[in-house]
């Protein structure tokens, strides 16, 4: 019988141990039992969560928001298996101190705590809050992104080539929401053979995920040829079976393409029928509107060159149903048997779809974006990954009705149209950059129509219409009943607005007639696919709350502008710049970070200010972060613009 340990002699006196535990600067937590009740916390933990009475409470009751973020699943695994686990820069969202839910990042180690007989009584954690480190890196990455051309030149050429060969975006269509993520393997950042595609064809949407055997530049070259061949067949109107048969014949001319796998699916927008073929590829995961998840039946088709043919199966997708295509890197993860890994993928996707899992602060995002990004992040961060991972997700939705606005040709018409158009474009799922471009073009059209209306009769009004077609194009028009108004040659800003509108959208036309003027635009909508090298940490995109009311704050040598700068507010800004700069004699900085719309009249005022400063030998510095409406427009008209730190843009608000 083993002698009982002399704790005081072996470990130290209880009071000394407690005092040392208390003063260790790292967060230390002891949990007990299968419900992970808090039994010990040190001063560092209490300083981290000062208002929470945790000792004696189950962890899930103290931090309920963490349910579904995979931290409790990790604690369960350590308690059940006795195997230590760790996490690096895990993003966790919960109420840490009673002040509301917030997002922080952590490094941690979880280890089992055993009784004298070897059985596990609980787990303990060593935790380091690394939020400051992560956010500093995010800020640095944002600055690198601002210098994107220089950054691209120093990146690995194979990675650059692969991203150039992959689909950079997914379409926006009336009957479905789509999202895509591509994760580059941490230990092999060279190009690989994974790819995805989404093609909007009017009456149907075709989704593709494929995987070529091998890695590196050779695999990427094979992938690009197969992707192009399949796109050509699908775009030409061939069925899933016909397209795959053609690619199977073509692959014989492409060394290294044998045994490539593909999953191709076609959604009929009207009926919801989803026809698919799993050509040697893992079957898609179907997540229904009521948040149940199951894998669809494989079709029995083999990879390219297998000679099995390409039989198809069909599912009917209801409104709210989602389908997830993926490559094997998602389910073949280190330390997980394939059966357990596939079940974990389905369970996690179902919990995120139901709202019980995932990140609570991500809720404002589109459901399909949360399903795609949260699933990828939460699934992989506890195991890591050895291969590139592609995840392409689509959720069927009811189409948004077309937009129709009729209003009088008054000075506030453009502002009214911008507000309604922004809301409609956001509802159909347009990306913020497309929203800015279309809103800008239509606003210029409306302002021209107002001038026509003032020349005749305001009550004749303006009609604005917009609709999203099944091919992913928005078609919009502005119709007025006024007469075209000529402008004096050389008048500042005249003619610039229509030229800018034509440059911002895919196609624009203006037709004049005796009964008025019709301005139309066509613009293909897309949302960027997300390419990442680290699933733990996502880079924050530029975001701004839409407050279109024009406000300008004048400080010493600095003007901060917010809201819409259009034909009704540009004159105010012009006067403020002239006064603050003393007509160009004094240097001035104009912060346009919070500008929601920069029309041609505003561009004219800024161009004039820069011209005055240049003539006087001083500076007029325009500030706007990359991705903002002002930065986009100023880059288009080639006015020099300086980026800003997006974390500080709204600090004073």
Curated annotation (Swiss-Prot):
The keyword Transmembrane helix is assigned to this record: no
Q: What cofactors does this protein use?
A: Mg(2+); Mn(2+)
For binding Mn(2+) 1, which residues are annotated in this chain's numbering? 211, 328, 387
Keywords tagged on the record:
ATP-binding, Hydrolase, Kinase, Magnesium, Manganese, Metal-binding, Nucleotide-binding, Phosphoprotein, Protein phosphatase, Serine/threonine-protein kinase, Transferase
Binding annotation for Mn(2+) 2: 211-212
- At the top level of its lineage, which domain of life is listed? Bacteria
Q: Does the keyword Magnesium apply?
A: yes
Q: Where is the STAS domain?
A: 546-653
Cofactor binding note: Binds 2 magnesium or manganese ions per subunit.
Where does the PPM-type phosphatase domain lie? 177-396
Q: Which NCBIfam families match?
A: sensory_box
Q: What is this protein called?
A: Multidomain regulatory protein MT1410
Organism whose genome encodes this protein: Mycobacterium tuberculosis (strain CDC 1551 / Oshkosh)
């Amino acid at each position: 019988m083993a002698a009982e340990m002399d704790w005081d002699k072996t470990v130290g006196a209880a009071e000394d141990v407690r005092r040392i535990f208390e003063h260790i600067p790292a967060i230390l937590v002891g949990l007990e039992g299968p419900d992970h009740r808090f039994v010990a916390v040190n001063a560092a933990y209490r300083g981290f969560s000062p208002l929470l009475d945790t000792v004696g409470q189950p962890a899930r009751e103290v931090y309920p928001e963490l349910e579904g973020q995979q931290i409790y699943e990790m604690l369960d695994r350590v308690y059940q298996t006795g195997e230590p686990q760790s996490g690096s820069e895990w993003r966790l969202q919960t109420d840490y101190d009673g002040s509301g839910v917030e997002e922080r990042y952590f490094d941690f180690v979880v280890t089992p705590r055993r009784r004298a007989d070897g059985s596990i009584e609980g787990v303990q954690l060593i935790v380091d809050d690394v939020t400051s480190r992560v956010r500093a890196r995010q800020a640095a990455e944002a600055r690198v992104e601002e210098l994107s051309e220089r950054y691209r030149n120093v990146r690995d050429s194979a990675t650059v080539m692969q991203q150039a060969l992959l689909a950079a975006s997914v379409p926006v269509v009336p009957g479905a929401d789509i999202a895509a993520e591509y994760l580059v393997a941490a230990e092999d950042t060279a190009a690989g053979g994974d790819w995805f595609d989404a093609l909007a064809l009017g009456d149907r949407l075709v989704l593709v995920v494929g995987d070529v055997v091998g890695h590196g530049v050779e695999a990427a070259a094979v992938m690009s040829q197969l992707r192009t061949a399949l796109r050509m067949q699908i775009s030409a109107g061939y069925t899933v079976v016909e397209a795959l048969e053609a690619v199977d014949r073509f692959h014989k001319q492409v060394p290294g393409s044998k045994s490539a796998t593909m999953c191709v699916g076609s959604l009929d927008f009207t009926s919801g029928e989803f026809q698919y073929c799993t050509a040697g590829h893992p079957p898609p995961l179907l997540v229904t509107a009521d948040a149940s998840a199951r894998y669809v039946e494989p079709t029995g088709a083999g990879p390219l060159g297998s000679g099995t043919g390409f039989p198809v199966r069909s599912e009917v997708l209801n409104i709210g149903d989602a389908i997830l295509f993926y490559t094997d890197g998602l389910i073949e993860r280190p330390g997980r048997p394939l059966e357990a890994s596939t079940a974990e993928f389905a369970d996690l996707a179902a919990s995120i779809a139901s709202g019980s899992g995932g990140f609570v602060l991500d809720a404002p995002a589109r459901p399909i974006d949360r399903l795609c990004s949260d699933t990828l992040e939460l699934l992989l961060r506890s195991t890591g990954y050895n291969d590139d991972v592609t995840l392409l997700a689509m959720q069927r939705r009811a189409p948004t009705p077309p937009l129709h606005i009729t209003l009088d040709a008054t000075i506030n018409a453009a502002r009214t149209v911008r507000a309604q158009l922004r809301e409609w474009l956001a509802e159909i799922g347009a990306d913020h950059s497309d929203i800015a471009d279309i809103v800008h073009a239509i606003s210029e059209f409306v302002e021209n129509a107002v001038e026509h209306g003032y020349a005749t009769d305001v009550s004749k009004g303006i009609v604005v219409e917009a609709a999203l077609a099944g091919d992913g194009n928005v078609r919009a028009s502005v119709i007025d009943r006024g007469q075209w108004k000529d402008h004096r040659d050389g008048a500042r800003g005249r003619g610039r607005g229509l030229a800018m509108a034509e440059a911002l959208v895919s196609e624009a036309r203006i037709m004049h007639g005796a009964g008025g003027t019709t301005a139309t635009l066509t613009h293909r909508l897309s949302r960027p696919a997300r390419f990442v090298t680290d699933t733990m940490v996502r880079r924050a995109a530029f975001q701004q709350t839409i407050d279109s009311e024009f406000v300008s704050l004048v400080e010493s040598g600095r003007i901060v502008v917010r809201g819409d700068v259009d034909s009704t507010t540009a004159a105010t800004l012009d006067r403020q710049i002239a006064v603050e700069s003393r007509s160009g004699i004094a240097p001035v900085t104009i912060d346009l970070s919070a500008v929601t719309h920069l029309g041609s009249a505003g561009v004219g005022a800024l161009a004039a200010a820069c011209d005055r400063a240049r003539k006087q030998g001083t500076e007029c510095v325009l500030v706007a972060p990359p991705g903002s409406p002002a930065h986009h427009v100023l880059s288009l008209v080639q006015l020099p613009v300086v980026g800003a730190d997006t974390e500080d843009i709204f600090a004073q608000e």
